[in-house]
Amino acid sequence: MSTKGKHPRADQGTDPFEEKLQRLKEAFNTGKTKTAKFRAEQLQSLGRFLQDNSKQLHDALDGDLGKSGFESDMSEIILCENEVDLALKNLQTWMKDEPVSTNLLTKLSTAFIRKEPFGLVLIIAPWNYPVNLMIIPLVGAIAAGNCVVLKPSEISKNTEKVLAELLPQYLDQSCFAVMLGGPEETGQLLEHKFDYIFFTGSPRVGKIVMTAAAKHLTPITLELGGKNPCYVDDNCDPQTVANRVAWFRYFNAGQTCVAPDYILCSQEMQEQLVPALQNAITRFYGDNPQTSPNLGRIINQKHFKRLQGLLGCGRVAIGGQSDEGERYIAPTVLVDVQETEPVMQEEIFGPILPLVTVRSLDEAIEFMNQREKPLALYAYSNNAEVIKQVLARTSSGGFCGNDGFMYMTLSSLPFGGVGSSGMGRYHGKFSFDTFSNQRACLLSCPGMEKLNGLRYPPYSPRRQQLLRWAIGSESCTLL
């Protein structure tokens, strides 16, 4: 693995990546990564990396995002360890050929799906969950038998340093590499032909990555974002809703792609929800949230300035304070927000929660459906029928009724977007499937040629009728 913490630059040569990428491709062509033994060894080493370097990872996440140990464990380290354990436990089963049914014409043949690796995979991770969103895709890529290039975000520089310097010590350096750099280097890296690209980030950059992939017809997964709606029905307990919404809105200082971006509720519910949210924020972070060890910080000055600008939208009902020196934005609730204001036109990605009033469930659903399909959608109600209505009449990458992003802790559920919020799914076996080519295989008998006479010329109406029956579903039913 490379590159020992150095950022390759274009002026150091015509192409700083070409030689290393060629070596990785050659390593894949040896078949080294395809064996179950190799895959298991690499997964075990990845697990050791997480265990051995827990303190370094926690310190890096704290340095980058002011992330508490609790949040780092819950949203980064533990989930990665769970994915490694799950892959190791199920690797042999996932790798097995999958038998499929045949028709009468192929009854003496063997049909199956073989899961084979794509080859050289590029994983580009963002800064907001820099361990989780790098390691979990890596688990799937290793389990599927690929060679991998990892591109961590240069914005979360402390975590980038840990990944670049320590992870190479645990994985086979002939098959895996960490490559560093900013937008210029990433753009140059994307000029190369990969066999699969996995990108997590903004829709704007996702379009750039997809355009680069299209030049080589490279398959791609895009894990993007968007404005995730949260509908709160009148028939619910405001304090329960406030507790759950405040926790996952302000988790990681709101820098979470599946966090609720705005609440839709009636005017009556808003009047109850605002004091309930204030109560939850005070209980979670104290009278002065700036001094709380449980509230993170904005990643950098650029994002801080952007969020500070959004505080001028609508009317501040809770919070609104900021400190540029600490990159601190207080947990904030906005009311009287207009649809045309910037806070409702872009993904917030910070600890700001606008409340938008609607007159009915139908109006709320219409509001959601007039916008791009989100990565996540939430609904709160004591009436199960209301939850069912929201689920049935909307579309999103993920949905949760009466809770936040707890579904993200389940490897049994696929994670991903739809439309502008992304394409493709991963987590658990879905990660293995994403990084595997589902190869359709049919092994026929080399003899018994007379049985094939039906399909050879000269054709006749009788043969056509028999062929239709032999290929059709009725023949399988009769047998």
Swiss-Prot record:
Protein name as it appears in the record: Aldehyde dehydrogenase family 3 member B3
Annotated active site: 223, 257
Family the UniProt entry places it in: Belongs to the aldehyde dehydrogenase family.
CDD domains from the UniProt entry: ALDH_F3AB (cd07132)
Membrane topology category: Lipid-anchor
Source superkingdom: Eukaryota
Organism name: Mus musculus
A Gene Ontology molecular function term of the record: aldehyde dehydrogenase (NAD+) activity
Presence of keyword NADP: no
